[in-house]
Amino acid sequence: MDIDLLSNIFFAMVRTGTPLLLVALGEMVCEKSGVLNLGQEGMMLFGAVTGFIVAFSTGNLWLGVMLAMAAGMLLSMLFAAVALGFNANQVATGLALTIFGVGLSTFVGAAWVGKPLTGFEPVVIPLLSDIPLIGRMLFAQDLLIYLSFVLFALVAWVMLKTRIGLIVQAVGENPDAASAMGLPVLRVRTLAVLFGGAMAGLAGAYLSLAYTPMWAENMTAGRGWIALALVVFASWRVFRVLLGAYLFGLASIIHLVAQGVGLSIPSNLLAMLPYLATIVVLVLLSRDPIKTRLFAPVSLGKPWQPGH
């Protein structure tokens, strides 16, 4: 396998892993606050269709990105109102949100299926993009991928080095103690949910405005569910989220790698690998639930109200 082929593989790995990275970062912050939102797939799809329609209608890709994030936040507000405001079951609410988001995106985007759009183009950084092996992977990507690098660094810094990160984690570990210390538990959790919605909307916008600049029904292809498994796989650790996202991205393009090295394996079989990998990860984690619980936020998925 020559260096040019490896460079192309790493380049494609980052492209395919970026939507997983974005949505998983948002979900990780949400879960760190103690809230389990299973509505990622629906929010991604609604963000994707909103971003595409806005960008197609106005010719402004960045306006599409911003309104895609707003669309994801809108659905996450609905989740927060039901799950946090009315203390509803978070799992059931998240599943309902996914069903609602999938149906809403299909309805809204029915007239826009297959329409062409000039999306974000790669921005090549001179000299740096010529670095062997990693040059194209890091310095010849589109602006949304560069934005994902910045957002990853920002989330890592906030969660690991700032008081805000400590507050989010305190709320997720022991909301009663956090409340007794004067921390606004419900407000922190609501903001974490909204951040997760914005990141899911951004991931959807990346799919419809950069990765494959078009709108197609169910174009997320289960990435929201994979991201949920990815957060558990990463043990709620931000750097492992980055690694896991790109590993799943690599699994998504393994059929192209096989073609590049001349392996005659059916492409449909290889295309199943990301989903098989998700199942394998969940099975392996379920074999050691005690270890998984050690890393999970203690109050994850548990309803909480002041004074209860």
Roles of regions detected by a PLM:
Residues M137-W215, V238-L243:
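Helix-loop-helix "hairpin" substructures at the membrane interface of multi-pass membrane proteins
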Residues V102-K161, V261-L270, P297-H308:
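Transmembrane helix-bundle core of multi-pass membrane transporters
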Residues Y211-Y275:
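Transmembrane alpha-helical segments in multi-pass inner-membrane proteins
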Residues V155, E173-A180, P184-R187, A258-H308:
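Cytosolic-side transmembrane-helix boundaries in multi-pass membrane proteins
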Residues Q90-A92, T118-V124, Q141-L147, R189, ...:
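Loop-to-transmembrane alpha-helix initiation sites
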Residues V23-A24, A48-F52, V102-T106, L147-W157, ...:
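Hydrophobic core segments of alpha-helical transmembrane domains in multi-pass membrane transport
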Residues M1-V23, L36, T50, T58-L63:
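Membrane-interfacial amphipathic/re-entrant helices at transmembrane-helix boundaries
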Residues G59-L104, L247, S252:
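Alpha-helical transmembrane segments within multi-pass membrane transporters and channels
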